[in-house]
């Protein structure tokens, strides 16, 4: 995992951007973060949409994080953090604007929130888009500290009221924050209940807008690529 010296500042991070992106439009670099046990390819539709709009490969970052065979082992602390941290720092360093946009799906939403707040990067993020995230917790994980036998539902996990979730609540993530959600999301709306504390769990504190679609958990990612691209331009 990279350790970024805070005194160094981020003003010089895009020194090589012009050389790297000479053939591309000057737009924010984009970081796309998949969900628990997912793959970077989960964002293929988004990637294709961005490419069609003129983004270069060097402007799109798709880190791969976490165990692919043990979803219950993944949380928001430790080895899961490194790939996302590296992608954020590398994206800022290579962005011709000095800023980035980020899009997360499912647990990728909360993992992005963790890294942005932990590293103090919110000032470098223009747009944060959270798709089908459990920003307020998953009822399938129960209420902390109960039903926390797995890492995914533990202290650093997604049980409702977990110390981790309480720690990111209300923290600034970007200049503009949006959520994309569904009332038929089979993961976030476990047992038919989507709300936590009277608010849809995918809604993010301070969001500029929230967009609702009649898709399932993965359909929200796969079938909203144009909406995602619109939000970051």
Located regions from the model:
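A composition/secondary-structure signal for short, hydrophobic, low-basic-content segments
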Residues: 3, 17-19, 30, 213
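Bacterial N-terminal signal peptides that target proteins for export
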Residues: 1-10
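Lipid deacylating catalytic domains
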Residues: 24-233
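Bacterial N-terminal signal peptides
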Residues: 9-19
């Amino acid at each position: 995992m990279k350790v970024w010296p805070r005194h160094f500042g981020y003003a010089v991070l895009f020194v090589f951007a012009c050389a790297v992106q000479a053939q591309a439009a000057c737009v924010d670099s984009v970081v796309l973060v998949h969900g628990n046990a997912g793959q970077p390819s989960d964002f293929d539709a988004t990637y294709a949409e961005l490419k069609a709009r003129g983004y270069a490969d060097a402007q799109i970052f798709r880190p791969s994080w976490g165990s692919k065979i043990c979803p219950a082992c993944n949380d928001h602390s430790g080895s899961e953090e490194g790939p996302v941290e590296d992608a954020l720092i590398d994206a800022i360093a290579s962005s011709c604007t000095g800023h980035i946009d980020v899009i997360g799906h499912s647990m990728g939403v909360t993992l992005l929130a963790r890294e942005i707040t932990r590293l103090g990067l919110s000032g470098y993020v223009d747009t944060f888009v959270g798709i089908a995230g459990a920003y307020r917790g998953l009822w399938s994980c129960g209420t902390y500290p109960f039903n926390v036998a797995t890492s995914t539902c533990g202290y650093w996990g997604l049980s409702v009221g977990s110390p981790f979730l309480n720690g990111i609540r209300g923290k600034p993530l970007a200049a503009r924050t949006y959520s994309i959600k569904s009332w038929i999301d089979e993961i976030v709306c476990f047992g038919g209940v989507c709300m936590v504390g009277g608010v849809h769990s995918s809604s993010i504190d301070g969001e500029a807008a929230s967009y609702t679609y009649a898709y399932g958990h993965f359909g929200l990612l796969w079938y909203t690529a144009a909406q995602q691209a619109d939000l970051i331009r």
